[in-house]
Amino acid sequence: ADVVQQFDEIIINQWLQKIILYAILDSFSGISKIVETRNDDEIRSMVTDNADVPTIFEYVLGILWYKASERHGKILDYMKLSLDADLLPKTHAAGGEADIVYEYEATEYYPEHTLLLEATLADSTNQRRMEMEPVSRHLGMHLIRSGNMNSYCVFATNYLNINVISDFRSRKTTPFYDPQDYSKSVAGMKIIPLQTSELKKIVSNGKTYKELYPLFEAAFNSTLLPHEWYESCINERM
């Protein structure tokens, strides 16, 4: 409880100021088609010198989501990071699951569910190769294990490739199989991609998770084609 309180105080005093979160996300947004344009030094100076930039992105995403969730939930358990004495990130704890696993109890705004948050920094060429399979696998196996089809995934990145959007949307109808047992499969996988530009809108517009959940659900149920879908269902509604 003491560590949680200490973390909350750090968050309240430093990170929940919109300007700080926004500024850090802004530095990540520079990583677009050429990954080298990323402002690593600026990012580290604002957060910590003790972690690599992808780990910092994960940490920032966790804090942003904790803020949007109105500081409900065991965020220190949900983030798969080892933290230093100041509760700043050091390393990612490797494992076969999503970067952040956020548990939500049922409320009037949404059913009980788990949200898998995947944080990826990539350039336009390697994102698809790096991330398509692990994201689908993490969510697919989670759904098969838990049986709760209300659970879903948010894929956060600095640059969204159109074919990444297309592949994630196709998971709405394409079954995912347990590779060890073909009798177990799930269809209707909900994967919502978010670019840092939209993460910044969550911060600047003070969006809460109870507002985001129905927005994501409506986006999932949309029949728009991928090249129209992100702009209409995500970007314009933030």
Which stretches of residues belong to each language-model region?
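Mixed-charge (acidic/basic) macromolecular-recognition segments
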Residues: 1-9
